[in-house]
Amino acid sequence: MSKIRVLSVDDSALMRQIMTEIINSHSDMEMVATAPDPLVARDLIKKFNPDVLTLDVEMPRMDGLDFLEKLMRLRPMPVVMVSSLTGKGSEVTLRALELGAIDFVTKPQLGIREGMLAYSEMIAEKVRTAAKASLAAHKPLSAPTTLKAGPLLSSEKLIAIGASTGGTEAIRHVLQPLPLSSPALLITQHMPPGFTRSFADRLNKLCQIGVKEAEDGERVLPGHAYIAPGDRHMELARSGANYQIKIHDGPVGMLAMRQAGAWTLAQNEASCVVFGMPREAINMGGVCEVVDLSQVSQQMLAKISAGQAIRI
């Protein structure tokens, strides 16, 4: 089996050295070249034809976002962004995911070398996932058509969504067409702490429904989506006639919900960037219906209107 060929673009010589050490320490991948800026990277991409690019956000001559936008338009390839763990860094990273980056790695704020080496296994796994990603499914999505508003649904109705790699854009595509009469949505998206608040704020500006990072003890309301804070779990508890969020994901939970009577949806392979969580849920028997991403919003509201609880 051939190794995954990686090219790293970063203006820091130390970061290029660290990324080379990390990539070359795994037997299934190799660093074929490094570049100090996007203009050098452009020539190296032509020369080495890498499978995956790791790309810093802030660089001289051309920043990472400008380069990513041009790259995805002219020569699409799997990209893993390398970003600082700051408010500004999270905003830029979310924009990179919109432009077509598969995933991202956050730089530690202190002890760069020790911190990055501690992330070695995580970085390698992100590179492996990126190498297998479907670029066709990760093309920028056009704004979905707003769905027709129906009567306000009962606070008893809920939709739960779980997402991992490639999920940020899929979630946007699902939430954006939902009318204010939609039931409450509870969302778990695999992200580090700090990024989920920026993600929620970004969606809140784009969607008709309210979108926010969930808070412990918060009452769940129709017409709102609640995103679990990074690295935390989210549960529901009864509070009188209402539901209340408890901040504390995946295929096993989905199977349990189906067994309890929920109607469960999974995104199909053709529209997934990485067909990981949906495949596991389908294989475990936790899925009632498999649909294309473009049909998820409409199917959710149709099932809810018919009186069924939904988990996707």
Curated annotation (Swiss-Prot):
Instruction: Give me the reactions it catalyses.
Output: [protein]-L-glutamate 5-O-methyl ester + H2O = L-glutamyl-[protein] + methanol + H(+); L-glutaminyl-[protein] + H2O = L-glutamyl-[protein] + NH4(+)
CheB-type methylesterase domain ranges (all copies) = 152-307
- Tell me the Gene Ontology biological-process terms attached to this UniProt entry: chemotaxis
In its keyword annotation, does this UniProt entry include Ligase?
Answer: no
Output the InterPro entries linked to this UniProt entry: CheB-like (IPR008248), CheB_C (IPR035909), CheY-like_superfamily (IPR011006), Sig_transdc_resp-reg_Me-estase (IPR000673), Sig_transdc_resp-reg_receiver (IPR001789)
Q: Which UniProt keywords are present, listed alphabetically?
A: Chemotaxis, Cytoplasm, Hydrolase, Phosphoprotein
Write the Enzyme Commission number(s) for this entry: 3.1.1.61, 3.5.1.44
Instruction: Return the broad EC class.
Output: hydrolase
- Provide the domain comment: Contains a C-terminal catalytic domain, and an N-terminal region which modulates catalytic activity.
Which function does this protein serve? Involved in chemotaxis. Part of a chemotaxis signal transduction system that modulates chemotaxis in response to various stimuli. Catalyzes the demethylation of specific methylglutamate residues introduced into the chemoreceptors (methyl-accepting chemotaxis proteins or MCP) by CheR. Also mediates the irreversible deamidation of specific glutamine residues to glutamic acid.
Which NCBIfam families does the UniProt record give?
PRK00742.1 (NF001965)
**What is the name attached to this protein's record?**
Protein-glutamate methylesterase/protein-glutamine glutaminase
Which organism was this protein described from? Shigella boydii serotype 4 (strain Sb227)
